[in-house]
């Protein structure tokens, strides 16, 4: 994403009664960096939420009902480079004004190969399975403007790259959301099965078309939320892992130091020549049959969390976390996922369950299959109380 300058006028309004969660509002304006003129019809939204608005003709906007926490603010207009920045309701800046820059027309030569002809017919199924998913929710979704997708297949590296010049408009009839997804990148490597995609997403709740449809949506949303990474991160933030139905096993690989010691002193050439006692020989051979590493399980995960001054939580770990979830009352069977860090880093969790950096966590198991767009729930979603 192109770099842009930031200078937008923002006012924070905190409101709410003690019996209700505190919410905030954000106001400001957007103008053209070259002319200084206000820009109307600009999309202003908090990434991953249903909180968004558009600017008026005078460039002004007002975004209300923001729950406490940290968010990525996205400001997007056709013909301009997108703007994004991290905001936290506890530390919002004041007296700022956003200026957007005209987007330069860049040649697509960097793709090396031209768009695949009949790209959707050739690669649409692959893209759908890894982007939208393969479950029941995915089968109830449609991409309204799939013609904006561009597919590039690189034969030498066996890699599929997909891009979109406009936000994807996705209708999720299973969960009752209309979604705008601004695709940042999508690539799938057929040689090793490695998938990478990211983007910004904005949700709009759909209007029911028949009696009872809202109840169906609410039930489906609750189920999707309970089985999600967002639910796990919120539970971890609140220290309610067990109460929310999760269990965690933290597995750490530790080297077999005794095997390393025996390797250093054991010489197969003198074994059986009388230079080593039979008891020692049996012991050495037993140790050498052991694995190079032992896996230790750590059940105390509370000590991994650090409370930060801005109300976020941070955690870092080595090894592999196995996360399980089940809810018998709602008919959700046992599922198991694992997560590990792709590089040494600290994962930062917001109160709403969002976390960063996204690319630092590698998921395997259930979440590797279900954390797709068809199962996405807004970060500002509030589930009903569990029975």
Name each region found by the language model.
Residues 24-26, 33-48:
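Short, ordered, surface-exposed loop/turn motifs in non-cytosolic proteins
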Residues 26-32, 59-61, 98, 110:
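A short, amphipathic beta-strand motif
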Residues 37-40, 62-70, 384-386:
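Short Pro-Gly-centered beta-turn/loop motif in secreted/extracellular proteins
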Residues 42-46, 73, 112:
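Hydrophobic beta-strand segments
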Residues 46, 74-86:
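A short, solvent-exposed loop/turn motif at the edges and junctions
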Residues 49-60:
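Short, acidic Ser/Thr/Gly-rich low-complexity loop/linker segments typical of extracellular
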Residues 53, 81-96:
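Structured interaction patches on ligand/partner-binding surfaces of diverse proteins
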Residues 99-387:
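Surface-exposed, low-complexity/disordered segments
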């Amino acid at each position: 994403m192109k770099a842009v300058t930031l200078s937008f006028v923002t006012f924070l309004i905190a409101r709410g009664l003690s019996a209700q969660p505190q919410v905030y509002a954000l106001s400001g304006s957007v103008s053209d960096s070259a002319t200084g003129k206000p820009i109307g019809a600009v999309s202003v939204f908090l990434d991953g939420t249903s909180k968004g608005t558009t600017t008026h003709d005078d460039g002004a906007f007002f975004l209300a009902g923001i729950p406490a926490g940290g968010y990525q603010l996205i400001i997007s207009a056709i013909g301009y480079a997108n703007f994004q920045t991290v905001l936290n309701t506890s530390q919002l800046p004041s007296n700022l004004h956003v200026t957007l820059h005209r987007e330069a027309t860049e040649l697509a030569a960097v793709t090396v190969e031209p768009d695949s002809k009949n790209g959707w017919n050739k690669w649409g199924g692959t893209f759908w399975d890894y982007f939208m998913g393969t479950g029941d929710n995915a089968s109830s979704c449609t991409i309204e403007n799939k013609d904006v997708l561009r597919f590039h297949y690189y034969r030498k590296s066996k890699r599929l790259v997909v891009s979109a010049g406009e936000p994807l408009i996705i209708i999720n009839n299973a969960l009752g959301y209309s979604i705008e997804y601004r695709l940042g990148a999508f690539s799938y490597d057929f040689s090793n099965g490695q998938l990478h995609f990211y983007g910004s997403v904005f949700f709009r709740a759909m209007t029911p078309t028949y009696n009872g449809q809202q109840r169906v949506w609410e039930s489906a949303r609750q189920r999707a939320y309970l089985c999600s990474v967002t639910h796990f991160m919120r539970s971890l933030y609140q220290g309610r892992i067990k109460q929310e139905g999760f269990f965690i096993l933290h597995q750490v690989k530790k080297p077999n130091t005794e095997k390393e010691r025996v390797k250093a002193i054991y010489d197969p050439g003198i074994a059986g020549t009388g230079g080593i006692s039979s008891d020692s020989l049996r012991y050495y051979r037993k140790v050498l049959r052991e694995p190079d590493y032992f896996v230790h399980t750590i059940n105390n995960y509370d000590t991994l969390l650090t409370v930060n001054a801005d109300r976020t939580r941070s955690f870092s770990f080595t090894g592999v976390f196995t996360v399980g979830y089940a809810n018998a009352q709602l008919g959700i069977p046992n599922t198991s996922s694992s997560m590990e860090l792709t590089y040494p880093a600290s994962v930062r969790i917001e109160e709403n369950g969002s976390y960063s950096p996204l690319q630092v966590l590698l998921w395997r198991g259930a979440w590797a299959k279900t954390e797709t767009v068809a199962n996405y729930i807004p970060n500002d979603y509030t589930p009903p109380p569990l029975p």
